[in-house]
Amino acid sequence: MYSWYFPKDSPSTGLGHRHDWEHVIVWIDNPEVPEPKILGVTPSAHSGYSSQVPPDADKVDGSSVKVKYLSKWPINHALESTGEGGDFQDLIMWTQMTDAAREGLSKTGWGKANVPMVDGNFEAKLGKAWPFGEKK
């Protein structure tokens, strides 16, 4: 799961809210192998998901998936798989964060937004986003 924080989710005047967390889940066949196969991609959109299983070839760049952040006017912002090129972003693993950083993410009041990768949300988000048949 890759997550992004946005200070505001307001695609149109008068609508929206402070704080937004969006995420994309990349489903792989085996995390133990050096080059796992990407089986599916599930980007978040507000409180829902869209899935591509398997992802279209143009939406994958080697071992990375291509995702864009967009405004779904007039309601909210979302992540979506894309065939467009872009930049790579640094990855910070949950286990690389300090205890203070993890605690801050877990205990801060984010209003209507939910931090997807904290212990209280992580497994539920994976279950809701599961794209392979019956939900886990």
UniProtKB/Swiss-Prot annotation:
Taxonomy, superkingdom: Eukaryota
One Gene Ontology term, aspect cellular component: extracellular region
Cellular localisation: Secreted
Motif Conserved undecapeptide motif I, residue numbers: 1-9
Motif window: Hepta-peptide GHRHDWE motif II: 16-22
Inducing stimuli: Expression gradually increases to a maximum at 7 days after inoculation of pepper leaves.
Chief location of this protein within or outside the cell: secreted
Family annotation (InterPro entries): NPP1 (IPR008701)
Keyword annotations of the record: Secreted, Virulence
Free-text comment on this protein's domains from its UniProt entry: Key residues/motif important for the effector activities are degenerated in most NLPs, including the nlp24 peptide consisting of the conserved region I (11-aa immunogenic part) and conserved region II (the heptapeptide GHRHDWE motif) that is important for phytotoxic activity.
Similarity comment: family membership: Belongs to the Necrosis inducing protein (NPP1) family.
Function of the protein: Secreted effector that contributes moderately to virulence during infection by P.capsici. Causes only small yellow areas at 3 days after inoculation of host C.annuum leaves; these areas expand somewhat and became necrotic at 7 days after inoculation. Leads only to chlorotic areas, without necrosis at 7 days after non-host N.benthamiana leaves infection.
Name recorded for this polypeptide: NLP effector protein 13
Annotated organism of origin: Phytophthora capsici
